[in-house]
């Protein structure tokens, strides 16, 4: 599904924006904003639900304890009362469904920006070398790798897969050819010969694991040396991997600290990611009663995540997407926090802010009043 969304939805949008302004950096920004706007109703539902639960949770927990204690000998009545409580305040899991629905699109967006044209595309093939007396008993099963769209010009791209007709198991001293081809069955090298710059996108073949068990030539010919496991990597250069944008030297550049030197553009992007994440956390807590534990978590979480991304190998283009997405998320949170709350939740919040912490009676109901984003209505 992720590959389908990437190829049929995200890459065409990317092509459209690049056609308007020939800058892959601007195309990333535009693609991110368009997808975030399209997902606005779903992410807004999650933010609203989280805001509602943050206010109602203390009251819900107290009422749940009272119900369980009062009807401990009557499970049916207990479930009935707990159901009424959920209807009154909403389920704590209500915000999960919108998140789950939008996840495939976000994963596809992430995968698109990690691949061609923004970064080099690796094909990793895990192989197993067996003794000759065992390989004869193996029923060969053809292998096909996941497909990746390879850009050879700004407007020309096609899906490419790696194939092994006899599968990933081979006998000692046996040689096999790993084929790169389009999903239509055309040989990748022959397709590249139709482009003036085609040789630029020929793969580099390496043994990333198990070099004592196997070797590979630069035309993809694999030769088994002795029994064991091995991994072959074919890496195809990304068209825009070395293209810059603003202060970013190369959108495909990976790593904060490489070969003894600091990549300050990567460091700046990671720092911007942390600051925008912190801003979003701060905005989500605005207008809420002070909570020392939650406040500490809101400060520590961005620091931990930011520190992780300093050493997590993400291309600069992906980090650019994450910063833009965080800015959009912070703006969205700011807008949604301005919406009016249902009357019963507003009363709970007012009591929390004034230190009363009163529990409202169970007759309070939001189901027949208004949605969280609607203004106060008078009947």
From Swiss-Prot:
Broad class of where this protein is predominantly found: membrane
Pfam families found in the cross-reference section: 60KD_IMP
Q: How does it sit in the membrane?
A: Multi-pass membrane protein
**A molecular function GO annotation:** membrane insertase activity
Which key words are in the record?
Cell inner membrane, Cell membrane, Chaperone, Membrane, Protein transport, Transmembrane, Transmembrane helix, Transport
The processes (GO biological process) annotated in the record are: protein insertion into membrane; protein transport
User: Would I find Kinase among this entry's keywords?
Assistant: no
Q: Which domain of life is it from?
A: Bacteria
Where exactly are the transmembrane stretches of this chain?
A: 20-42, 93-113, 264-284, 303-323
By its UniProt entry, which CDD domains does this protein fall under?
5TM_YidC_Alb3
NCBIfam families assigned: PRK02654.1 (NF002734), yidC_oxa1_cterm (TIGR03592)
Family classification: Belongs to the OXA1/ALB3/YidC family. Type 1 subfamily.
Relate the assembly described in the record: Interacts with the Sec translocase complex via SecD. Specifically interacts with transmembrane segments of nascent integral membrane proteins during membrane integration.
Q: What is this protein called?
A: Membrane protein insertase YidC
